[in-house]
Regions:
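Carbohydrate-active catalytic/glycan-binding domains of CAZyme proteins
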Residues: 1-331
């Protein structure tokens, strides 16, 4: 009688050390994950930047070398939210760099290997004079091969439909290292749960500041779903929601989220501030997984989590967050 072997399982967090803004891709049969490490988040980088994990089975992750050769120090020491995409025979790393939470620029670095080293191209994707704060670059390739860059930037105008704060944008890419223009708005904050901080001092004034950030786009059944994180990344208000469009450039709608994030939110006492997600369809080529970070219970480290993403009649929902529990990785 043949012995049936149990399927391998994940157990969250899948990597125990600090690993925020996680992004996973596959190259040459190997899974890679890149994220914001503790030194990058604290602005205390030494040597190369952005930790990279590797896995052969999507279950067990080991730390390798960091990916990015540090660009000129005048750009700052806080490096956030890396994403890597292969194109042709090279790999393109998108990230932001700045001084604390000020003057962040979107940059691109290139390598011949998924592990790096990645070397910065020497220029920003956006004009820092016109756009003094831009973060969370997410390149997306549509079915026709055209690339677009989703990202987050600040807005100071206030209308009945839009609050001051960080919002989502999309721009058509001229090449892997150039944008055609600054693009257009995807979504502005509209709801109380998206508040980052009341009475926040920014740009010489005090604002009721709201935040949408961490865009990630998945096309599903002909529609474009732009996932994003809203609220404050440092507490339990943070969570994942989405907006939907019939065209990659919009208009995007997010009706039905007035009460809070629908995809992923805090579970008090267990998982705090889950967010900044990416999505990967692995390892069976059919099952979608939401890759995200969440705080440990002591609020000392953001760690990498993976849970299944399901598409329901009401929209995408995460089968989580889970903590310390195991589930089958479908192979």
């Amino acid at each position: 009688m043949e012995t049936v072997q149990p399927k391998p399982v994940h157990q969250n967090p899948v990597y125990g050390s600090y690993f925020a803004d996680p992004y996973i891709w596959k190259s040459g049969g190997i899974y890679y994950a890149i994220g914001t490490g503790e030194l990058e988040a604290r602005g205390e980088v030494r040597g190369k930047i952005f930790p990279v994990l590797q896995s052969e089975d999507f279950l067990h992750w080991t730390l390798g070398d960091s990916a990015l050769v540090r660009p000129e120090e005048s750009l700052g020491a806080h490096f956030w939210a890396p994403e890597v995409v292969p194109h042709g025979d090279r790999f393109f790393l998108y990230y932001s760099v700045g001084h604390g939470d000020k003057n962040h620029q979107l940059r691109v670095a290139i390598s011949d290997s998924p592990l790096g080293p990645y070397h910065d191209t020497g220029k920003s994707l956006l004009d820092p004079e016109r756009c003094p704060f831009a973060i969370d670059a997410h390149p997306f390739q549509d079915d026709d091969g055209q690339w677009y860059l989703f990202y987050a930037r600040d807005f100071l105008d206030v209308t009945p439909q839009a609050r001051a704060g960080t919002a989502l944008m999309v721009a058509r890419m001229k090449s892997m290292t150039e944008l055609e223009d600054e693009g257009r708005v995807v979504m502005r904050a509209q709801h109380d749960w998206q508040r980052f901080q009341a009475n926040r001092s920014m740009y010489g004034k005090v604002w009721d500041w709201h935040t949408l950030e961490g865009p990630f786009v998945r096309k599903h059944e002909g529609r474009y779903y732009c996932f994003y994180s809203g609220g404050r990344w440092e507490n339990d208000t943070y969570g994942v929601d989405y907006c939907v469009a019939e065209s990659v450039l919009g208009p995007y709608l997010d009706e039905g989220n007035e009460a809070g994030p629908r995809v992923l939110r805090t579970v008090p006492g267990q998982v705090i501030g889950p967010g900044h997600n990416s999505i990967v369809t692995e390892p069976d080529g059919e099952t979608d997984y939401l890759v995200y970070h969440a705080w440990d219970r002591e609020m000392k480290a953001r760690q990498m989590f993976i849970d299944r993403l399901v598409w329901t009649p009401e929209g995408p929902r995460c089968e989580g967050p889970t903590w310390g529990s195991a589930f089958n990785a479908r192979t």
